[in-house]
Structure formats: structure tokens, C-alpha cells
From Swiss-Prot:
UniProt-listed InterPro entries: Aldolase_TIM, RibuloseP-bd_barrel, Trp_synthase_alpha_AS, Trp_synthase_suA
Pathway as given in its UniProt record: Amino-acid biosynthesis; L-tryptophan biosynthesis; L-tryptophan from chorismate: step 5/5
Designated name of the protein: Tryptophan synthase alpha chain
PROSITE patterns per UniProt: TRP_SYNTHASE_ALPHA
Gene giving rise to this polypeptide: trpA
Keyword Amino-acid biosynthesis annotated: yes
GO cellular component: a single term: cytosol
Quaternary data: Tetramer of two alpha and two beta chains.
Active site (catalytic residues): E47, D58
Molecular function as annotated in GO: tryptophan synthase activity
Length: 271
């Protein structure tokens, strides 16, 4: 299944696509794979975070998960093996979230090539402004990986135009300026950010940072997709099942007022 097909399928069902985020190797190697099996029935796409020692864009929940995964021995090689195992479980698009340093440490061509071979669909690069290293972005695309970059409510229209010119797969709209984390309500600026991005690209737009339940999912569902990370990682940290949270979020994504023009008959039962 391609990325565009995954978003189109969700849209045909009258909802935004659900993109769960899980940290590779957290809470353990086996626990990660169990979590993947739990989220896959609800997921349209899946985002896998590569643990990193200095995750500037991540809030405390994901920082703790990364630290624990690294202490337990998770590495780029370990993440490669996990991506390969996840790919054996699903045909849904798989995106690797990675900071730039591991890419440079392994060598971009080797890093991108190995993750493509392992089954990754694309890479999300939160700390790479694409216009600062267009050659690296082009290399990833030539190898066959889609490239996803972040835009924030503070992004200017000129910045949006630059980023979408380099993006493939989808565009990641950050709901708040700051780090990842759970919030009770998303700022109203997220609607305007999605509108401004969609005015400049035909690519799907996914909103992330702050989605923690049905209400925030409904707010974020003005976009084509919604990324849920910290809330899932916190549930894993606390030893809770992920299914109740995923069911609640899927209900929020199904709200027709967040998807104008859809008919009642387009609704489908949740998993």
C-alpha cells in the first residue's frame, strides 16, 4: 500500500488517517513488537522513532522512552532489524523518524539504503531544513524513500512553500511550537496552518504534537492524518493496553464536522 493510498482509504471512510508513533525498542524489543501488533488494526500508517541521545524536538515522555531503549541496547542496527520485522507484519506505510546525526554517522547513502531494504516507506527528518541540504534529500528520494519535514504555526508562507517543494509522501504539521507531548486542547492556529499548507501542495497533511484523546483528535482531524505519539508511549510506560486509547482517538477522527462534505453513509465501523 502506498502512502497516498493509505490516506485515500481513510478519507473514503469519512475520517482522518491515524498514524501511531512508537519508539523502537521501547519498552523492550519484545514489548515494541507487541505494541506494533496492538496498533496495526487501528493504524493507516505507522511511525517508528529511532532512539537518539539528544532528541531536541521530543518532550519528556518520548525522551524517557529513547533513553530506556538506548540503555537496553537499541541501536541503528537494532532499529533496522525491527523495521524488517514490522514490514513482515504489514503492507501499511512505515516511516522512520530520525534526527540527522545518526544519518550522517552511518553515511546517508548507507543509512537510507539499508532502511529502504528493510522495508521503510520514508523518513521523517525533524531537524533538517530541506533547503539546507537538498543533496541529502534528493539522495533519499533517489534511493526510494519518501521525505517528510515539519512545519509549525510560526512557519511563514515562504517557508511552507520551500518545505513542500522538497517533501514527498506527506507534510507534517506541528500543532504547537515546542516539543512533543500530550495536551488537553490544541491551539486554534492548527486549522490555519493546515489551510496554508494545503493551499500550496496536493500532498496529504498530517497534524502531530499534542493529540492525547478524542477531543484533541477531533481538532487535529481538520488535516488528512493525525499522528499520536506521547499518549501511546505513556500508556506503554505505565503498562496499559493501547486499544482503549486507539479506539477513543479513532472516534475523534471520525467526526464529520472535521471532514466537511462527507456523507453519513461513508462511516465505517471501528476495528
Amino acid at each position: 500500500m502506498t502512502t497516498l493510498e493509505a490516506f485515500a482509504k481513510a478519507r473514503s471512510e469519512g475520517r482522518a488517517a491515524l498514524i501511531p508513533y512508537l519508539t523502537a525498542g521501547f519498552p523492550s524489543r519484545e514489548g515494541f513488537l507487541q505494541a506494533v501488533e496492538e496498533v496495526l488494526p487501528y493504524a493507516d500508517l505507522l511511525e517508528i522513532g529511532l532512539p537518539y541521545s539528544d532528541p531536541l524536538g521530543d518532550g519528556p515522555v518520548i525522551q524517557r522512552a529513547s533513553e530506556l531503549a538506548l540503555r537496553k541496547g537499541m541501536s541503528v542496527q537494532g532499529a533496522l532489524e525491527l523495521v524488517r520485522e514490522v514490514r513482515a507484519l504489514t503492507e501499511k506505510p512505515l516511516f522512520l523518524m530520525t534526527y540527522l546525526n545518526p544519518v550522517l554517522a552511518w553515511g546517508p547513502e548507507r543509512f537510507f539504503g539499508l532502511f529502504k531494504q528493510a522495508g521503510a516507506t520514508g523518513v521523517i527528518l525533524p531537524d533538517l531544513p530541506p533547503d539546507e541540504d537538498p543533496g541529502l534529500v534528493r539522495l533519499a528520494q533517489e534511493i526510494g524513500l519518501e521525505t517528510v519535514f515539519l512545519l509549525a504555526p510560526t512557519s511563514t508562507d515562504a517557508r511552507i512553500a520551500t518545505v513542500v517543494r522538497h517533501a514527498t509522501g506527506f507534510v507534517y504539521a506541528v500543532s504547537v511550537t515546542g516539543v512533543t507531548g500530550m495536551r488537553e486542547r490544541l491551539p486554534e492556529e492548527v486549522k490555519d496552518l493546515v489551510r496554508r499548507i494545503k493551499a500550496r501542495t496536493a500532498l496529504p497533511v498530517a497534524v502531530g504534537f499534542g493529540v492525547s484523546g478524542k477531543a484533541t483528535a477531533a481538532q487535529a482531524a481538520v488535516a488528512d492524518g493525525v499522528v499520536v505519539g506521547s499518549a501511546l508511549v505513556r500508556a506503554l510506560e505505565e503498562g496499559r493496553s493501547l486499544a482503549p486509547l486507539l479506539q477513543e482517538i479513532r472516534q475523534g477522527l471520525q467526526r464529520l464536522e472535521a471532514n466537511p462534505g462527507l456523507k453519513e453513509s461513508s462511516k465505517k465501523p471501528l476495528p
